[in-house]
Amino acid sequence: DETVRRFAALTPAAPDFRIFWDNAYAIHHLYDDRQDQLLEILSECEKAGHPDMVFEFCSTSKVTFAGAGIAAIASSKANLDDMRKSMTIQTIGYDKINQLRHVRYFKDINGVREHMKKHAAIMRPKFEAVLKVLEEELGGLGIGTWTKPNGGYFISFDSMEGCAKAIVAKCKEA
């Protein structure tokens, strides 16, 4: 939450500075009982007096079909009005058939949540296997740290200074 507030409180020198906020993993939870919730940046920017500073993006590209999902943009009215001016001449229209496919398949937010539970059932064992190996092989050695995410699709690993090239080389050997 503190990081979101710090972004919202930025006072950039350039009047057209914008934050492009990719909220890609908002619904990608691995566990029903442990779900990270990020503070909502649009309202925080508005509270901080910078309602036009952020464009927030989301899509179903990691929910349904990569490259064939549907996407959305959230921002201030002024930003959206400005964006509509250029979007009107950049595209002949949205893929309404694909939008209809998504609506018919999911029906509502509960359908999306149930679908994401299926994703979690596939992803959770993979995350847990990687975390188990990291802990068994590297835990307690003080040579690296890693995240234990509650969602998303990545585990971040931080190694000791100067080890990245050797780690990448070892990964290529595997």
What is the predicted role of each segment?
Residues M116-L131, I143-D158:
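Conserved glycine-rich beta-strand-loop-beta hairpin in the small C-terminal domain of fold type I
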